[in-house]
A protein has these predicted regions:
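Positively charged n-region of N-terminal signal peptides that target proteins for export
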Residues: 1-4, 20-21
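C-terminal motif of bacterial Sec signal peptides marking the signal peptidase cleavage site
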Residues: 15-18
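Extracellular beta-rich repeat passengers
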Residues: 23-59, 63-70, 74-75, 88-95, ...
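Active-site-surrounding "flap" and adjacent substrate/cofactor-binding loops of secreted or lumenal enzymes
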Residues: 92-106
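Sec-dependent signal peptide hydrophobic core
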Residues: 5-12
């Protein structure tokens, strides 16, 4: 067993050694399931306590209290495992956590008393927004979290107490599924599913992050974003399918208690019906992609259908936190200057059309209309347009149907307000979709710095930008769900 631990440690070191600042699509070949340390028995209920070792393939575990991984320890979960989390239990990660599901044998982390529902979804009637089990909370001593091919269902129960001493942003009462705060660590979430959250799916205060090829449904009750990295976090959010979010699908912000710029490549995502459940002031600035508070982002090749707002580059209320990263060049940054384009929009009413290029509702914006977008908003608004100005987008309603394989567009009135899950719909593109072949593969590169690439202890592959807009590519690459 010690030999297995040594081998695993060596693999972990190899994973970090494979990091680089270059670009391109790094892919690793799948390897057989591994075991770290001793096997964890599934006989009886696992009480709150410290755990390390391996949950074995295909077994079902029931958990009644917080699973804590101590600093220096590793918990590995093999393919096909189901973990039934009761009593609002969490994973408290001070060491390393590795979940290695596969496409044919995914892992499931769930609240066993809750069941998924299809059709119209509303807060107060759908338990997806209430939080069943808690989340995965990672402290500053957690160096590596790898989550692959895993269903995370009904998470987000409120933290009952502060799980560790934090210098970042976690506090009792938080309701995230994923939380990470080690600026030197790596967090990998790939090829997985998230169903139901009451608040943000993920909150990062530092770290090297790869969020890729996931499907996210019913996220945020009356507030909350999908993926929400804060200051000093860097990485990629790409090839994700995000439907039915309360606020934004993806957001970046150089704020919080972690110093440094937040920098992300945000590309080839599909956003559908996002931004309608946040009715507060922040609801007037939500919908698909939000870049704010001096964060830097590369936002390309995204397909945005029936969302409350298009890609939004925020200024700040009353001149505070004025956004400079799109006008200030910095050669030392991973992203030298914020840039965006080649994004595809479809809208079903005038209110959406009036915010394809967001206006200064709630706070000033500095989003420039782009000629490479579909529709061509630079041509539509004209050379005299000043960012933030109100305009009439009514003539854009119903144009550029992306031609999903199976989804009603034009949508029935109000359908975007309550259809918050995939159900039996298929968001792949038909062969004659106007979104095929309209993306860019050369205008930008993904971030690779600090992201390990390894079949077990890192990313399975940083997928390069795709030529088709959205997360599903006509050549079969991209999101595999």
């Amino acid at each position: 067993m010690k030999k297995l631990q040594i081998i695993s440690a060596c693999l972990a070191l190899f994973a970090f050694a494979s990091c680089g600042k270059g670009s391109g699509d790094k892919t690793v070949v799948s390897v057989p399931q591994i075991q770290v340390g001793k096997a964890i028995s599934n006989t009886g209920t696992l009480p709150a306590g410290s755990y390390k070792g391996t949950m074995l393939a295909g077994q079902t575990y029931t958990v009644s209290g917080d699973i804590t991984i101590n600093a220096g320890d590793t918990l590995l979960i093999q393919k096909g495992v189901t973990v039934n989390m009761t009593n609002g239990a969490n994973f408290i990660v001070n060491g390393d956590l590795v979940m290695l599901g596969t496409q044919t044998s995914p892992i499931t982390i769930t609240d066993p008393i809750r069941k998924k529902t299809t059709g119209p979804s509303t807060v107060g009637q759908d338990s997806a927004y209430n939080g069943g089990w808690g989340g995965i909370y990672c402290s500053s001593t957690s160096n590596l979290v790898v989550l692959k091919w895993t269903h995370f269902n009904f998470g987000g129960a409120a933290l009952k107490a502060l799980p560790f001493v934090s210098t970042a942003g976690v506090k009792a009462g938080d309701q995230f599924i994923f939380y990470f705060e080690n600026p030197n660590g790596a967090f990998i979430l790939e090829d997985s599913w998230v169903y139901g959250t009451p608040d943000d799916v993920a909150r990062f205060y530092g770290g090297h992050v790869n969020i890729m090829r996931n499907t996210v449904e019913k996220f945020g009750s009356t507030g909350g974003d999908g993926f929400n990295p804060k200051g000093s976090t860097t990485g990629n959010m790409a090839y994700n399918m995000l439907i039915g979010g309360a606020t934004n699908g993806t957001k970046t912000a150089s704020d919080g208690t972690s110093a440094g710029e937040c920098q992300f490549a945000i590309y080839n995502n599909t956003y559908v019906n996002d931004g309608y459940r946040n009715t507060g002031v922040y609801g007037a600035r939500s919908g698909s992609v939000e870049v704010e508070n001096n964060s830097r982002a590369l936002v390309y090749n995204n397909l945005i259908a029936d969302c409350d707002f298009g890609v939004r580059i925020a200024g700040g209320p009353g001149g505070a936190k004025v956004y400079l990263a799109d006008t200030t060049y910095n050669a030392e940054d991973l992203i030298t200057q914020t840039a965006y384009g080649y994004n595809f929009y479809y809208v079903d009413n005038t209110a959406m059309a009036d915010q394809i290029v967001p206006t200064s509702v709630a706070q000033p914006v500095v989003t420039h209309p782009e000629a490479t977008d579909i529709p061509n908003m630079a041509a539509f608004l004209g050379a005299s347009y000043t960012f933030g100005e109100v305009y009439d987008g009514s003539s854009l309603v119903g144009l550029n149907n992306p031609m999903f394989v199976n989804y009603p567009l034009p949508a029935p009135a109000g359908f975007w307000l309550t259809q918050a899950s995939i159900d039996g719909y298929n968001f792949h593109l038909q062969s004659n979709s106007p979104a095929i072949g309209k993306g860019t593969t050369t205008a930008f590169s993904p971030i690779t710095a600090g992201i390990p690439v390894n079949a077990n202890f890192g990313s399975s592959g940083i997928t390069a930008p795709g030529k088709d807009m959205g997360c599903y590519q006509s050549n079969g690459s991209g999101n595999q769900h």
